[in-house]
A protein has these predicted regions:
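Structural signal for interior beta-strand "rungs" in well-ordered beta-sheet cores
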Residues: 218-279
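A generic "binding-loop/recognition-motif" signal
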Residues: 10, 21, 59, 77, ...
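Catalytic-core segments of class I nucleotidyltransferases/pyrophosphorylases
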Residues: 98-100, 107-132, 137-213
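Conserved N-terminal catalytic core of the sugar/cofactor nucleotidyltransferase
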Residues: 1-5, 13, 27-112, 268-279
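Conserved beta-strand segments of alpha/beta enzyme cores
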Residues: 24, 70-72, 186-188
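Conserved catalytic-core motifs of eukaryotic protein kinase domains, centered on the activation segment
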Residues: 16-19
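Active-site metal-binding loops of divalent metal-dependent hydrolases
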Residues: 10, 104-106, 137, 253
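Active-site regions of enzymes building and remodeling cell-envelope glycoconjugates
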Residues: 69-74, 142-149, 247
Length: 279
């Protein structure tokens, strides 16, 4: 088996944050999302360029530089190929293996197990023929993208038989693999009962950061914080002289004296991205 972490997307809903970094490199709890994904699959045994790959496109040079030699890199030269096309472009590297596919922007956490073991049920007892999805139970009304009473939670497991014929064109796994497998009775949903956020909007991105921080604040030891903070995440080299509450200050960010940053993300000295949860 092998693993692919999908990190090519632009993250348009997360703009203007993603004007500075690709979504995969946006920090959650002061750790880039991509590093969280790589750590999770490494704990399952996918920890070198022979067993784990990362794709890149939007601001791809940042992803390439960040990954270095930790994984096989697949740089898509034009527009992102989507989740299916991105996997297809790595077909020669996959070379007959089953593949665990994870979204870099998926934030998962459970109090019952560390990253890696928390999704190990996705691999347990797999026969190499079915398609498996990690799914959160749906407690409210169903959505068109749901799978029965479950909602996709960032990771899927694909057999080689479903990968080898994928076209290297912009398209999504939900259309090329998941729904066809569901129609054929070859889709299994493995339940995940922990926290899952796709970090696709500023509000969800803030929620993931606050979850990572727990009940208090998470302050990088290199940050300078003289102001008040409550449920805040403050990155490396940041300077906080004002008040931060339910907020994220990116590495190198500045909160000036007298400022009150609340339900927002601060980038640099003057960019404030509101992240108020939807009513």
């Amino acid at each position: 088996m092998c693993a692919i972490v999908l990190a090519a997307g632009e993250g348009r809903r997360l703009r203007p944050l993603t004007a500075y970094r690709p979504k995969a490199l946006c920090p959650v709890g002061n750790v880039p999302l991509l590093d969280r994904a790589l750590h999770r699959v490494a704990a399952l045994g996918f920890a070198d360029p022979d067993t784990v790959a990362v794709n890149a496109c939007y601001l791809g040079e940042q992803v390439v530089r960040h990954v270095g030699g930790r994984a096989r890199l697949s740089v898509e030269p034009d527009d992102p190929l989507g989740t299916s096309g991105g996997v297809a472009r790595l077909r020669d590297w996959i070379d007959g293996r089953g593949v665990l596919v994870g979204n870099a922007d998926a934030y998962l956490a459970t109090p019952d197990a560390p990253p890696g073991p928390d999704i190990a049920a996705l691999l347990a007892g797999w026969d190499g023929r079915t398609v498996r999805l990690l799914g959160r139970p749906v407690t409210g009304p169903s959505r068109p993208g749901d799978f029965g009473r479950h909602r996709f939670a960032g990771f899927s497991l694909l057999p080689w038989s479903r990968v080898r014929g994928l076209p290297v064109t912009p398209t999504e796994l939900v259309r090329t693999v998941w729904r066809p497998a569901e129609a054929a009775g070859e889709l299994e949903v493995v339940e995940f009962t922990g926290t899952y956020l796709d970090t696709g909007t500023p509000a969800d991105y803030l929620a993931a950061n606050l979850h990572a921080a727990g009940a208090g604040s998470l302050l990088d030891p290199t940050a300078t914080v003289t102001g008040r903070h409550r449920r805040a995440v403050v990155g490396a080299g940041a300077v906080v002289h004002g008040t931060v509450e339910r907020a994220v200050v990116w590495p190198g960010g500045v909160v000036h004296p007298g400022e009150h940053l609340v339900d927002a993300v601060r980038v640099g000295a003057d960019l404030t991205v509101p992240a108020t949860p939807a009513a």
